[in-house]
Amino acid sequence: MPEVHRYLCDRLLMMDKGKVVEDGDTETVIKHFLAPIEPVKPLAPIKDEKNAVVWIDGAWKKYDMVTHHTLIRTIEMQDINIKIPRGEILGIIGPSAMGKTVLMRLLGGFEKPDRGHILIRIGTVDFANIAEYGKRSIEARSKLGIIHQEFALPPYQLVQDLFARKIGLKKLEMINQAMAKAKEFGISDVTMDVLLRLADLPEAEAKGRLRELGFEIDVLDDLFPKLPVREAFKAAEPYLKAVNLPEDIFTRYISETSVGEEIRLAIATLMASNCEILLLDEPFGDIDPISLRVVTNSLKELNREFDTTMLVVSHQLDVIRELTHEAILIDEGVVAMRDKPDEVCDAFIERRFK
């Protein structure tokens, strides 16, 4: 990243297509490298700051930090209370291993709080507590889409199949069909809720958890039918446009896309499934700043056009400053600060949150 190079380097090489195309002082090379970067798109204002769609209500969660099967320490998230209005992009920052990903897993329904509620709006005024399993949680979680740390889409899958499968797993009409089918096999709503949560996990973790329950990964394909390709394209079209991807990407293999395109594809598949709330847990990885700007501008476009609510965990503070309406800082399992992104990022850098 340019900020790291500025801090560490006196000299830089710039490479393109396997060749060194420039060798010079750090600032000059960075300037040339960033020349084609898109301008920053403005962030749309929140329409109604009192219209909460996510509500973490007094959540407590004790968790262990383990490395190589060795317990490092135990951290307790204590009495977390956060309301997030529809259409807000909320940044989440803080030191490593201090609760950010645990918070996202609570919001995704992959972990249950020891106490408290994780509430998602399912009607005009009604909330469902996704810490409880069943039909209401299924409806609430159909509105949630998550991209995990170091995510990877299956490289040899066609993009059209990716959309068809994800819509089958997330769109409420498809879920209702699957639940009716499950009843014929004696599968309860609670079990279906568990299966749908596991389907949102990274593939390796999902396979392991399914086997613990006595299922193979194929159970998801058996219960949740893919959307026909023509219908999948119709659902995908407006979101491909919003994230600045060409329509012909729909017929490519995922291995034929770039890293920046892959992230935008993952986002578009969730949006095409009618997700209203995106949970982005450090999905940007080592993406270059030019591609990253395209991604952040695409997220702003989705937010502006569809009023999508987003929670974004990132260690890249420039992303938080540029992308979010507001940010929170989590340290030692507690929300240490909530304010404008620049204020929170500056406090984090200067260690003013202790």
Which residues fall in each region the model found?
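Q-loop/switch helix immediately C-terminal to the Walker
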Residues: 157-184, 200, 209-222
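Conserved catalytic motifs of ABC-family nucleotide-binding domains
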Residues: 146, 151-161
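Catalytic Walker B motif of ABC-type/P-loop ATPase nucleotide-binding domains
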Residues: 278-281
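Conserved beta-strand-loop-alpha-helix hinge in the C-terminal portion
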Residues: 19-40, 334-354
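ABC ATPase NBD Q-loop/coupling interface
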Residues: 117-139
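Helix-to-loop junction immediately C-terminal to a conserved catalytic motif
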Residues: 108
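H-loop/switch region of ABC-family ATPase nucleotide-binding domains
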Residues: 1, 314-315
